[in-house]
């Protein structure tokens, strides 16, 4: 049986750390940043962990 392909959209959006946690970027950090406070853009630049409820599904997509 051939290997399953990983979901290309999910592989761009999520990454697995060395300890197995799945990390994602925060929203609202792509464009129209001029009027957003610097404090907010700094806060949004930190990656966050995916919730455990979604982690199982994402792990399946990543293969």
From Swiss-Prot:
GO aspect biological process, one term: translation
GO molecular function, one term: structural constituent of ribosome
Pfam families documented for this protein: Ribosomal_L35p (PF01632)
Domain of life: Bacteria
Keyword Ribosomal protein: yes
Ribonucleoprotein in keyword set: yes
InterPro entries reported in the protein's UniProt record: Ribosomal_bL35, Ribosomal_bL35-like, Ribosomal_bL35_CS, Ribosomal_bL35_sf
Any one Gene Ontology cellular component term annotated for this protein: cytosolic large ribosomal subunit
The entry's keywords: Ribonucleoprotein, Ribosomal protein
Family: Belongs to the bacterial ribosomal protein bL35 family.
NCBIfam families, per database record: rpmI_bact (TIGR00001)
Name by which UniProt lists this protein: Large ribosomal subunit protein bL35
Organism whose genome encodes this protein: Thermobifida fusca (strain YX)
């Amino acid at each position: 049986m051939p290997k399953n392909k990983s979901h290309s959209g999910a592989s761009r959006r999520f990454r697995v750390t060395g300890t197995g946690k799945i990390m994602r970027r925060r929203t609202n950090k792509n464009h129209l940043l001029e009027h957003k406070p610097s404090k907010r853009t700094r806060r949004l630049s930190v990656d966050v962990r995916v919730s455990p409820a979604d982690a199982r599904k994402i792990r399946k997509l990543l293969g």
